[in-house]
Each structure stands twice: as structure tokens, then as C-alpha cells.
């Protein structure tokens, strides 16, 4: 969860303990990573006091492909930290579209599916 305003700061949001456990879990063998979250860094609901630390943590995951968020309810793709990691935001269902991602051996692609 990256929606910090849902908590009274008694629990860290994002949960860095969870991220650390995921990074250190040697029983999981995966070659690529996609990070999904509600609110992305820079959002008014993200604890922006820790956005740089969050970015440092997620950069450690194996072959990070991209990050996906939905809080803004609009299509967005941005390199928020100028480090090559793209944050993709999707619309809400009222806008009658969604993102379809395809992961390939050479990277990833996405398309906006309208319905």
C-alpha cells in the first residue's frame, strides 16, 4: 500500500519491512519485476518524505520492468526520477479503458484497450 493518508503514521507507508523481506526471500526465483501500487511517488497520498528511499528500494528488485499505479485515474507514463524506471498510470473504469501489458524476452509493451 502506498496510500499514506489512510494511516496515522503509526505504520510506515510504504511498508519498507515488506519490501526488504521480498528482496531477501531467497526461496523466490523470478527474473523480472513489476511493481504495482495505488498512489505513485509525488502524489498527495504518497508520503513524499520517503519517495527517494522508496525508489532506492524498488531499484534493487531483479530486472524491474515498470511500476503501475491507478490513483490519478488517468493514463500517464513518466520517468519520475530520471533513472529509466517508468511509472504507468491507468484510467478508472468509468473512462471505459484499461491497460494491457505484454512482457517479452526483450522488454515490455502496453496498449490501451477501450470498451
PLM regions with names:
Residues 3-82:
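His/acidic metal-ligating clusters that form di-metal
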Residues 75-115:
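Binuclear metal-dependent phosphoesterase catalytic core
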Amino acid at each position: 500500500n502506498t496510500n499514506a493518508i489512510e494511516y496515522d503514521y503509526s505504520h510506515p507507508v510504504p511498508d519498507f519491512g515488506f519490501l526488504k523481506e521480498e528482496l531477501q526471500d531467497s526461496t523466490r526465483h523470478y527474473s523480472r519485476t513489476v511493481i504495482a501500487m495505488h498512489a505513485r511517488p509525488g502524489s498527495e497520498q504518497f508520503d513524499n518524505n520517503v519517495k527517494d528511499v522508496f525508489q532506492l528500494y524498488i531499484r534493487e528488485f531483479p530486472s524491474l520492468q515498470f511500476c503501475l499505479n491507478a490513483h490519478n485515474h488517468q493514463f500517464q507514463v513518466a520517468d519520475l526520477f530520471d533513472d529509466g524506471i517508468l511509472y504507468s498510470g491507468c484510467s478508472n473504469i468509468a473512462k471505459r479503458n484499461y491497460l494491457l501489458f505484454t512482457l517479452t524476452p526483450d522488454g515490455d509493451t502496453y496498449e490501451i484497450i477501450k470498451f
